[in-house]
Regions:
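Glycine-/small-residue-enriched capping loops at alpha/beta junctions
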Residues: 1-104
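Small side chains
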Residues: 17, 185-188, 233
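Phosphate/ribose-phosphate-bearing ligand recognition and processing surfaces
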Residues: 79-190
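Charged, low-complexity interaction regions
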Residues: 174-182, 193-202, 216-227
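Short amphipathic alpha-helical heptad-repeat segments
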Residues: 181-188, 200-212
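Flexible loop/turn and low-complexity linker elements, especially glycine-anchored beta turns
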Residues: 192-193, 203, 230-245
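Cationic, hydrophobic amphipathic alpha-helical membrane-interacting segments
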Residues: 207, 211, 216-218, 229-235, ...
């Protein structure tokens, strides 16, 4: 599965399904949901009214109508109230339900907005750190998942979460398993902010070599601390341009 973290407008995204941060009433309450409702048209809004309510931690699906995606998944994440009321569990539940609905329809290419981090005040870094590992593991059966970000800060948070995911998993692997995982991790990290649907093999190979030049010394450390992971992640993050926006 290819996982990309890109800047863009989710309401204009070309994918089989779009997943956005919805309210329990399915009425638009943030900038992304407002654009989706506006561009989806009257039939789209009517289908949301017909569905009525959706509980926090769950998701429902409608057709895309006038949007470029065939299906829209309305995922209801939690409001942040300090992290003591099970917000992370509810957030992950909303992502899981969205993946389940997409899988039921045999969708292959999904595009996600950042759930709960705008009007619901969920801390961005915490949301990204929770969501990305789930998407990379439980979303492995899809061809591609895009995290469509509305700001460079959002893109940086989800990119860093993906880099941390791979560094941690590589560090925990051993022997042949680590070598096999590196063959997957190198291209995955190199393509993380790539806008190209079919990247040039030579250019991709060069990017992978840059990644490996950072990761291999990190993996040779006998004891890897959080500081070591942070340092390796910072070096990988420095390889990406300040922002990458997909042409839609």
């Amino acid at each position: 599965m290819q996982f990309r973290v890109l800047l863009g407008d989710l309401s204009e995204w070309k994918a089989d399904g779009l997943v956005y941060s919805a309210s329990s009433t399915l009425l638009p309450t943030n900038s992304v949901s407002s654009k989706i409702h506006q561009k989806g048209g009257l039939s789209f809004s009517a289908s949301c009214r017909t569905l009525g309510m959706c509980h926090v931690g769950s998701a429902v699906m409608t057709k895309g109508y006038k949007l470029k995606a065939s299906f829209i998944i309305h995922a209801v994440g939690p409001y942040w109230v300090g992290g003591k009321r099970g917000e992370e569990g509810e957030l992950l539940s909303a992502y899981k339900k969205a993946l389940h609905l997409a899988d039921e329809k045999h969708l292959k290419h999904l595009a996600f907005a950042s759930l709960s981090t705008e009007e619901k005040r969920y801390p961005l870094q915490r949301a990204a750190a929770a969501a990305v590992p789930l998407l990379l593991t439980e979303g492995a059966g899809f061809d591609r998942i895009d995290m469509v970000c509305t700001s460079p800060e959002e893109q940086e948070a989800y990119t860093k979460a993906a880099v941390f995911f791979w560094l941690r998993h590589l560090g925990e692997a051993a022997g042949n398993e680590q070598a096999a995982m590196m063959e997957e991790a190198g291209p995955a990290l190199a393509l993380l902010q790539s806008c190209d649907d079919a990247p040039d093999p030579i250019a991709l190979s060069e990017e992978v070599k840059k990644i490996e030049a950072i990761v291999h010394p990190f993996l040779k450390l006998r004891k890897r601390s959080l500081v070591d992971i942070e340092q390796a992640a910072s070096k990988i993050m420095a390889l990406y341009p300040e922002s990458r926006t997909e042409g839609v």
